[in-house]
Regions:
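Short, glycine/acidic-rich beta->alpha junctions
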Residues: 150, 183-187
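Secondary-structure boundary elements
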Residues: 129-133, 161-163, 194-200
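Short histidine-centered catalytic/ligand-binding loop motif
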Residues: 58-60, 105-109, 174-183, 219-221
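Short amphipathic alpha-helical face segments that pack within enzyme cores
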Residues: 70, 187-194
Length: 255
């Protein structure tokens, strides 16, 4: 029986936890604290204190996350859109607030949000190369494993023939290469190759303004850069564990 030990030292049967990871509340809630991820690693690259804050403070830029959630559903799992609630007006409207009380904010979107996401997702799904990627693929597949003796989780947007494909939106597709480095997408690619035992990683990218669509493969140099960042992130996590009072953590160096 293959098992996985989480950051809180709880041990799960690998098969059982993968089944639980299909539930978003378990995946983002419980495992958000008790397993590392690409997003957690990016915080650790900033500092152990930045990682600590990410565990204890509410997320910012919530609208971008909402837009991304809806676009992902419409492109990858359009059948699930039928289970969402859409309302007239803004998120300040009485109708929206009542709907949130009934089914939760993650299940309620305004018609304006719907129309924006629909326009983008229809463009993505209309591209022949993207259609070929989606045909016969599996979507939103979870994985969990250890890296440098630490539990890591991940969820592949698209998994097909040993290739992990991630759907990204961007404000400027011409600058995606720069964005990929800035947002450490190389770290995500390196981690997911490890988690899924995949041999390649690609990005399907859509420009939210121009609706241009791009498909970007990852070079060996890109993956190697991600591995270096991943190793730094795990070192920072061990620093986090060894810091008696994280509020006193300081970054030290000599100029």
């Amino acid at each position: 029986m293959e098992t996985i030990k989480l950051l809180n030292n709880e041990v799960f049967n690998k098969k059982d936890i993968l089944s639980k990871m299909m539930d978003d509340e378990f995946y983002y809630g419980y495992l958000g604290v008790n397993a590392l991820s690409s997003s957690a690693s990016k915080k650790l690259l900033d500092s152990p204190y930045a990682y600590y804050r990410s565990l204890t403070e509410k997320q910012t830029n919530v609208q971008a996350l909402r837009d991304g959630q809806l676009i992902h559903l419409m492109v990858l799992e359009p059948q699930k859109v039928d289970y969402l609630t859409f309302t007239e007006g803004t998120k300040a409207s009485k109708q929206y607030k009542l709907a949130v009380q009934e089914v939760g904010s993650h299940n309620v979107f305004t018609n304006a949000e719907y129309n924006k996401a629909k326009k983008i997702s229809e463009r993505v799904r209309s591209v022949t190369d993207v259609k070929n990627i989606l045909d016969g693929a599996r979507f939103e597949i979870p994985a969990i494993d250890t890296y440098n003796d630490l539990a890591f989780r991940g969820k592949a947007d698209i998994l097909k023939d040993g290739v992990v494909i991630d759907l990204k939106t961007t404000a400027d597709i011409k600058g995606f290469e720069r964005s990929a480095n800035y947002f450490s997408y190389d770290l995500q690619a390196a981690l997911y190759l490890e988690l899924f035992g995949a041999f390649d990683f690609e990005f399907v990218v859509v420009d939210k303004s121009t609706l241009d669509v791009g498909i970007f493969k990852c070079s060996d140099n890109f993956i190697d850069s991600g591995k270096r960042k991943l190793d730094i992130a795990t070192e920072r996590y061990y620093d986090y564990l060894q810091t008696e009072n994280i509020e006193d953590y300081v970054t030290r160096g000599t100029l």
